[in-house]
Amino acid sequence: MEDVLAEKLSRVCKFDLPFIPCSIPFECHPDFTRISKDTDAWALRMLSITDPYERKKALQGRHSLYSPMIIPRGESSKAELSSKHTWTMFVLDDIAENFSEQEGKKAIDILLEVAEGSYVLSEKEKEKHPSHAMFEEVMSSFRSLMDPPLFARYMNCLRNYLDSVVEEASLRIAKSIPSLEKYRLLRRETSFMEADGGIMCEFCMDLKLHKSVVESPDFVAFVKAVIDHVVLVNDLLSFRHELKIKCFHNYLCVIFCHSPDNTSFQETVDKVCEMIQEAEAEILQLQQKLIKLGEETGDKDLVEYATWYPCVASGNLRWSYVTGRYHGLDNPLLNGEPFQGTWFLHPEATLILPLGSKCGNHPFITI
């Protein structure tokens, strides 16, 4: 199935990317500059990155900015820890993409024990797997700073994430493209956004949500709607990079694969953009319901959560426009603002020209 999809995609050299509106407010954490600088310094030190190219690649990925861009409120020290956590998970996620099923299961056992504090890495292990050392340091802080119920929820998310990453890796090895519904469920877990977004929002803002609230249907749907918005945006704006590395587990690829043969790739792009808007509408609807519930029951923490959690979606959207992880290094397009236009699928960088453009004389285009 993957080979057939790859052949269809080989004929796609460009598509039109429309403006993606978002009515959810966007703002960074007030201390984002310091948090980003300190987190980057920590990650470079932990990973022993000294090579100039690898350093540039790490810094232009903007990993340290992700958490301050999606969680604009909260205690600075906790926001920095959340940023370190996100940096760590980016590294672990990249490594996990190449796991065999056996390697994945072994890594799951180690990481879960490290997270629980029942296994301490040796110096030799830290040297061999610096990402595990990063993870161990962050988890130690979480265990001491998170309330036990919140940490228990985090651990549940972690187990689901690790299991889903291994499952997805096995599908990729088998060159199997899942159904849209299967992919939706799998992607919610492999994104790890319930933890990176929802739980970190509670943690940074020191919110105490009752078990009956977090298990209520509206709250669960609210969390999922934000996750869906995040992964749809990420799959759309990372498509060039995913195509380059031949990773076909992506909303665009899955929808295109299972669409009728006469469906154009542009129709697939338009469908994903439509799904992003549907997710935003659901977020806003559920936000109002939960704010109203919080006000009626006197649950101030629920009101705070419902007010700020949607910023995960708007912050992720903005971050997805500025990361070199998706768009290539030293790309002048990444000026902090959203972009739209005809996207030429150059392997090294995102290239956008006004809608309807042909390749022309753009200095990067060799298609």
Curated annotation (Swiss-Prot):
Signal peptide: none annotated. Transmembrane segments: none annotated. Mg(2+) 2 binds at D93. A motif (DDXXE motif) lies at residues 93-97. Keywords: Lyase, Magnesium, Metal-binding. Pathway: Secondary metabolite biosynthesis; terpenoid biosynthesis. GO terms for molecular function: metal ion binding; terpene synthase activity. Its EC number is 4.2.3.137. Mg(2+) 1 binds at D93. It catalyses: (2E,6E)-farnesyl diphosphate = (E)-2-epi-beta-caryophyllene + diphosphate. Its cofactor is Mg(2+); Mn(2+). Induction: Not regulated by alamethicin treatment. GO terms for biological process: terpenoid biosynthetic process. Binds 3 Mg(2+) or Mn(2+) ions per subunit. Mg(2+) 3 binds at N234, S238. Belongs to the terpene synthase family. Selaginella moellendorffii contains two distinct types of functional terpene synthases (TPS) genes, the typical seed plants TPS genes (SmTPSs) and a microbial type TPS genes (SmMTPSLs). Sesquiterpene synthase converting farnesyl diphosphate to (E)-2-epi-beta-caryophyllene as the major product, and to two other unidentified sesquiterpenes. Has no diterpene synthase activity. The Asp-Asp-Xaa-Xaa-Asp/Glu (DDXXD/E) motif is important for the catalytic activity, presumably through binding to Mg(2+). This is (E)-2-epi-beta-caryophyllene synthase. It comes from Selaginella moellendorffii (Spikemoss).
